Amino acid sequence: MKWVTGLLVVLLLGLQYKLWIGEGSVAEVWQLRQTLEAQRAENEELRYRNAALDAEVTDLKTGLDAIEERARRELGMIRRDETFFQVVGRPGETP
């Protein structure tokens, strides 16, 4: 009878070790879930960014308005019939 009880105790301790410390333990599963949630959030942000970039590429391929806007904003270009005015503030003055 003692050896049966001892065997059951050893078996219980072995299972508890596996549950709390071993591979696939509660702590490891919790950490993997946290990592998975962080990755899902990052993927969602990247999906939004990719959708915006895809829309911009489509707009650049199909219309001249997007190209003109980008040339004005990033390259400072103007049309031939336009006059460019640059307003400069006084030194030390913040806009």
Curated annotation (Swiss-Prot):
Alphabetical keyword list: Cell cycle, Cell division, Cell inner membrane, Cell membrane, Coiled coil, Membrane, Transmembrane, Transmembrane helix
Q: Please list the residue ranges that the record places on the Cytoplasmic side of the membrane.
A: 1-3
Tell me where the transmembrane regions lie: 4-21
Q: Where is the signal peptide?
A: none
Q: Which residues lie on this side of the membrane: Periplasmic?
A: 22-95
Topology versus the membrane = Single-pass type II membrane protein
User: InterPro entries in the record, alphabetically?
Assistant: Cell_div_FtsB (IPR023081), FtsL/DivIC (IPR007060)
Naming one, the record's GO cellular component terms include: cell septum
List localization entries: Cell inner membrane
One of its GO biological process terms is: FtsZ-dependent cytokinesis
Coiled-coil zones: 26-73
Which domain of life does the protein's organism represent? Bacteria
Q: Does the keyword NAD apply?
A: no
State the family named in the UniProt similarity comment for this chain.
Belongs to the FtsB family.
Tell me, what does this protein do in biology? Essential cell division protein. May link together the upstream cell division proteins, which are predominantly cytoplasmic, with the downstream cell division proteins, which are predominantly periplasmic.
Q: Subunit info?
A: Part of a complex composed of FtsB, FtsL and FtsQ.
| Protein name (record) | Cell division protein FtsB
Q: Which organism is it from?
A: Thioalkalivibrio sulfidiphilus (strain HL-EbGR7)
